[in-house]
Structure formats: structure tokens, C-alpha cells
């Protein structure tokens, strides 16, 4: 897979969905292929903190999680092991990621524990993950900090280093993003530049 873009909004057709489309346009304009995965379209159960992943040292991949074969969380995780470029887009809900997105992030706990037994994916080459965050609030000193911190350590599960996020304030109702030509241009440029850098390696 060339590039995978995860869109984390619960709302279909909102601004972070639009950001995902713009990133894809940027990647394609640079000669890459991009797939957008909408997290809301997948069934993801909550981590139960059952401890199964701590003791199931003879299991790998999705079998390391007690819920791994009962929902679609692993289906979303898989591209993160192979994609050459990774992007996340998300709105901000109460200074953090939306609940469905955060539920998926929480389900990656088994990957942290799997590192202790050196599953094959742990030696993946380091890659970069890029993020676009949009918030309805026009102000807030730490408006993006919760989402950024969670994504930083989530990405590390897959040997992905989170680049400085592209963030936008005062983007709330559908169409707000497109109302700012400079915003849409910056997102498209991010997609194009990110893929161009990957393609040169």
C-alpha cells in the first residue's frame, strides 16, 4: 500500500473527512495511491483491560488480543504495518480524539505488550505519520495536546514517528474548511510533499 489515510470523525461529510480527501488529492498529484479508511465504518469493541495480551505470549498478531477476532480493529491496524505513508485526520472533541477513534487507539495496548516478545513487526523501519486536526473552538492553549499526545504514542506501536500536526481552529460546520483556501492548500501540499519524500527513498 502506498498511503493510508485514517479519518476519525463520527460525522460523515464533515471537515476532517474533507481534510482526508485533500490529503488523498495531494498524494495522487505526486504520483502515489491513497486509500481513505473511515474509522466510523468499522466495528471496534472497547479494550476490557482483561490482561490477556500480557499472558498470551504464544500468540501473535490479532490473536494476542482477546477481542482480536471478534471485531474489525485488526483490519484497521494492518495497513499501519505496510503503508509507506500514513495520515490521520480528526476533529477535536473535548480537547481530545472522538470516542470511536480513541477506542481504536486503546485497543492497540496489546501491541505494546507484544514488543516484549519481539513479534516480527517490531523491527519495521521507522516511518513518518502526518496528522490534520480541526477544532470548532477558535481558541484554547492546549486545544490539540490531548489528541497529539495519544497519536504520538499510538503511532510508535508501528514504528511511526508523528510529525508536527497541521492544526486548524474555528472549523466547525461542514464547509468551514473549504471556506479558507489557504487551509485547503496547506492540506493538499502536505499530502503531496509527504508522498514525494517517501517516493524519493
Each language-model region and where it sits:
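N-terminal beta1-alpha1-beta2 submodule of the flavodoxin-like/Rossmannoid cofactor-binding fold
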Residues: 1-90, 95-113, 173-201
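Intrinsic disorder/low-structure terminal segments
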Residues: 80, 86-87, 153, 157, ...
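Beta-strand-loop-alpha "switch" segments that mediate conformational coupling across diverse proteins
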Residues: 163-170
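Residue-level signal for alpha-helical context at structural boundaries
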Residues: 21, 34, 41, 119-123, ...
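Short, glycine-/small-residue-rich phosphate/pyrophosphate-handling segment
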Residues: 100, 116-163
